[in-house]
Amino acid sequence: MDLCDFIIEHENDDLSSLVLHRDRWPGIDVALAAECISARRKLRYKVSEWYADPAIICPLSLSAEQCSSTATAAYKAAVATGRAYRSRKFFERASCVAVAERTVPPPSQKALRIADLTGGLGVDCWQFSKVASAVLYNEMNHPLFEAAQANLPRLGCGNVEFSKVCISPSTLPGLLDAFRPDLVFADPARRSGGRKVFLPEDCSPDILALQDMILDRGCRLLVKLSPMADISLMLRKFHNVKELHIVEADGECKELLLLMEPGFDGECTLVVGNAGRSVPPDSTGDIRFTLGEEKAAEPAFISREPEPGQILFEPGAALSKSGAFNLISARFGLEKLGKDAHLYCGSQLSADSAISGALAPFGKFYEILETAPFGNQAIRDFATRWPGADVTARALPINSKALQEKLKSGSKKKQNSDSQIHIFGVGTFIGRLLIAASR
């Protein structure tokens, strides 16, 4: 039995027990096998194409946890080519081929050369190779480097070159001059002993110290940052930022992507993108705006209680991260409920317009069922009429858990994100309200 067969045979076993009884398999590196099994479990839904091939080597479980998913890697490839990202479901519905499924670079991109300075497990390189003529994979970690050398050719990436250089101001010029990339990608690793770090200068390589060296060579620079990073601060720290992408997948804000272009001195465009959901055929697939547009946007505010049949919109994680709170109202004809509530309502007609456009992939739409002034009587009435509803408190002196306890919604049905009924307690411009709504 070889290592691959062992991994497949024991992929559902308890890993601690497997390692404890390693003597049963003297010809197998059981510790390595356990690490690979753990990594494969993380890749099963994240990068299902890799999981499907048992010969794909995943030597570090942590790398599998931290690597891009198929969708977020394909999103980066779309940014690299200047395309708006479309999820695979959209292309399947339109009888097209998604970026994630391309095997031949489109004619306009045949000359594109991409250098990935922080190759890692290689998922991003795998997607870059489908839209570029040549890709440079660079990684200092030896197990990851060896795994990528085996995995990427097996995955059909015949246009990838491999390098194992420690990126620094002294080594980077030679690497760039030899490969001559059009775009450089970097996903700096935290070097903080497990402590959360949201500053690029606290990561390795220090892209802040290298950005001028890259841009001065005429290369575009694409940098992945923590979704917790402060957008305004990043725009002050980095130069020539043309686009900043806030990427959502599976209901979470997964990453920030800064796209820098040599010589660009205009205002950065913020792009809210969803790497995990399909978008309507008439949508561009993202929401684009500048901080200046958000500042100048004049939102509409509710002047009376929302009525049954109206639509309630709750922005998703990426749209909320972008800070486009006034622009949502001004651009899509929705009314803000309150200054800090970040909920919006509108007529069925205006909501239909938003649903068919760019808002659909970036939040949840509800139909309002009932509205009442916030108070003890309304809480008792809602608890009786809407048992088991999900509960959210916005701009109130109590949090969602406290409101849930008042409504006793946990007593008959466990609160979960799949509930069709949602009760919002909201501080609005016209006072505090309880709103019952249906997905």
Q: What spans do the regions from the language model cover?
A:
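SAM-dependent transferase fold signal centered on methyltransferase-like domains
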Residues: 1-439
